[in-house]
Amino acid sequence: MEQEKKNIYELLEEDIMNSDLSEADKAAKLSRLLQVRCKQVNIMLVGATGSGISSTINALFDMNVAKVGIGVDPETTTISNFVLDNLVIWDSPGLGDGVERDKRITRDIIAKLNEIGEDGKPIIDLVVVIMDCSSKDLGTTYNLINKVLVPCLGSEAGKRIILCLNQCDMGMKGNHWLKEENKPDEVLNQYLKKKAASVQARVKDGTGLDITPICYCAGYSEDGKEQCKPYNLTKLLHRIVQIIPREKRLALADKINTKKENWEHDDEEDDYGEETTKDFVDVVFDYIEVASEVGGKILGVPGKILGGVAGAVIGTITTIFKSIFG
């Protein structure tokens, strides 16, 4: 019988319990871990039909949560949520398939964005807005941003919205995409930068928010054959982790898609894998309490060490990400 996989909190609890700390110190650290464990992360993905909401969910996270469609018909008909322990993904139906349908979807989005949790804060931590990079008509999405998301999120809108341009391989109708290297050539790269700048300017003009979009490709297949591998998912994940409140980040740690090929290709403007790992390790330092500092690195991550437990705790975190990012 296959042993049930332990989540990140259970692994960290084991590390603390197996340490040589005093019982009082163990109790204190377990208490802080419990505080973190009680935090739930809610991420909503929105966009037009065909922008790739479901394929993005499946590419980022370790779950087969929705059928990924290649055709033009909507694949998701009602707003859905997928629960992975403390991580909840809200998959909003695609917009643009009828006025009445859009009104219903918009009402659902507004209701969810205005929902307040037991802590008195909004349920939704982050909204990922997905646009089709190959589309010239993004009016439906701009309307959603200007008239729904920003008014609902208020003063925190700039901190809780990520703008994404998916299917960047099709930005120039499939031209100038280096299939073997799975990245854009210089011509397409410059086009993508201009496209992102145009979207950024349009959103700023309509809302006053200055948000830099991320160009990426969630990857997709047709008739069982892979058409394009994921590209720049590392950058998107890094942005998500940065925006999620620090005390909630651990909810994502072991819920990331473990397919290494999903994380192999990006724009190389930064080492997103290493930076993401550091973001998670910071949570350990903040909430499991680290007592002393030493030089050097722990499994490649600079930082402080807490007797025997920090090495184990940090080891748990970095092992997860090194197996993914290499």
Where are these regions (language model features)?
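Conserved GTPase G-domain substructure that encodes guanine base recognition and part of the catalytic core
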Residues: 1-88, 93, 98-282
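Membrane-inserting effector segments that mediate pore formation, membrane fusion
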Residues: 274-326
